[in-house]
Amino acid sequence: MQRSQRLRSPRDFRRVREGGRTWSHPLLVLSVAPARANRVRCGIVVRKSLGTAVERNRYKRQVREATRLVYDQIRPGWDVIFIVRAGFRTAAWEQIQQAVSRLLQQAQLWHDREQPSQEDRHG
């Protein structure tokens, strides 16, 4: 995920947490709020009680990668925060990807892009 696609300032995190809506999953919590620009920005929060700095950074990298893989499917115009929960520590990669996708769908931020049919691809 590029730097311009990330939430960075504490003010932005506070705005999303206080003024947005929240959905939960055993691995992650998703908070969303309308963005000021027509793009998607993501932030990730991992509390200190979830492990050492090395572990917390690994969790952030995993969520960032799962989000990057579906970034084009997220409807623009939203700021998104993923909060890592304790169950994340033992989750497999597939479970993490599924949790990210499911939360985005619950929040109605999932934008299915039309896939061209076989006939369209081959003329």
Curated annotation (Swiss-Prot):
Highest taxon listed in the record's lineage: Bacteria
Catalyzed chemical reaction(s): Endonucleolytic cleavage of RNA, removing 5'-extranucleotides from tRNA precursor
UniProt keyword list: Endonuclease, Hydrolase, Nuclease, RNA-binding, tRNA processing
Gene Ontology CC annotations of this record: ribonuclease P complex
GO molecular function, one term: ribonuclease P activity
A Gene Ontology BP annotation from the UniProt entry: tRNA 5'-leader removal
Uppermost EC category: hydrolase
RNA-binding among keywords: yes
EC number of this enzyme: 3.1.26.5
Assembly notes: Consists of a catalytic RNA component (M1 or rnpB) and a protein subunit.
Annotated HAMAP family: RNase_P
NCBIfam families, sorted: rnpA (TIGR00188)
Family, similarity comment: Belongs to the RnpA family.
Protein task: RNaseP catalyzes the removal of the 5'-leader sequence from pre-tRNA to produce the mature 5'-terminus. It can also cleave other RNA substrates such as 4.5S RNA. The protein component plays an auxiliary but essential role in vivo by binding to the 5'-leader sequence and broadening the substrate specificity of the ribozyme.
Protein name, UniProt field: Ribonuclease P protein component
Species of origin: Herpetosiphon aurantiacus (strain ATCC 23779 / DSM 785 / 114-95)
